Amino acid sequence: MTLRTLRSAMIILALVAVSVLAAPVHSRPYEEIRARGEISVCANPNALPYSSNRPETPGFQIEIARALAGRLGVRLQIEWIVPRMRAALVDCDILMDTIARPGIQPPSIRLSAPYQTGGVALAFAPGQPTVEAYRDLKSGTRVGVMTNSVASMIVSKSGARMVPFGFEDEMLEALAKGEVDAAAVSPASIGYYNLTNPARTVALVHAEDSEPELKWVVAVGLRRADAPLVDAVNAAVAALVADGTIAGIYARYGVDYRRP
């Protein structure tokens, strides 16, 4: 299973945004969800460690959504999103790992309290010296970046030599082989790569901590939710954070839990 996650996540968000804007804007009351006994989540079937249609490794988004549904006392229904599917046909209630920044999401999506910190970290090849911040990258250092990404613009200011990639899994493979010295990659992808490749791990540095544009928090995005549903999801998220459920789920995929 590949880690083509960043582009896949962007596709998911774009599709969901289109479907939200195309669909009639009316609330999905909490009582309606309780009455039907299920809540649905949008997810990509091939985007580990985020989500997968493999029952044995469903991805942390699916596991957290399932735990959330359990707290709400309902079943989880998964609505798989693939690029060829018309987004308007997807009618899910929630979207995990929704970036909680003003102005990014359409008005019809409400956000829960944040439950994880995300961003674009730096990974370093085995044996390579690390730096703590993007600005400390040395001139001539070969740094893998996603094509036309914000991270690529930040790396370009450092004097390092950018090497463009289309997918994170290709970048991490090149990094492990020493074809690049460092890479700007999501911490989740780095952690999962190290978990699944224990013989050739790469070093993770949370360099995004010094770059506001490359660090954010994520929340549950709720489509057309009423206030009682938002309140119920917030209570469920708080409980799953407090009892260690969310941290434990991330750990199963090699991902650091960084509580917002």
Where are these regions (language model features)?
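N-terminal secretory signal peptides that target proteins for export/translocation
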Residues: 1-5
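Bacterial N-terminal signal peptides
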Residues: 9-20
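Extracytoplasmic small-molecule ligand-binding "clamshell" domains
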Residues: 25-99, 103, 107
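Bilobed "Venus flytrap"/periplasmic-binding protein-like clamshell domains
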Residues: 40-48, 55-72, 99-102, 121-171, ...
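Periplasmic-binding protein-like
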Residues: 44-45, 116-124, 195-238, 254-260
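Extended ligand-binding regions for polar small-molecule ligands
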Residues: 59-71, 128, 135, 141, ...
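Hydrophobic residues within well-ordered alpha-helices
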Residues: 68, 87-91, 137, 175-176, ...
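A ligand-binding cleft/hinge motif common to bilobed small-molecule-binding domains
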Residues: 85-89, 99-107, 154-157, 181-214
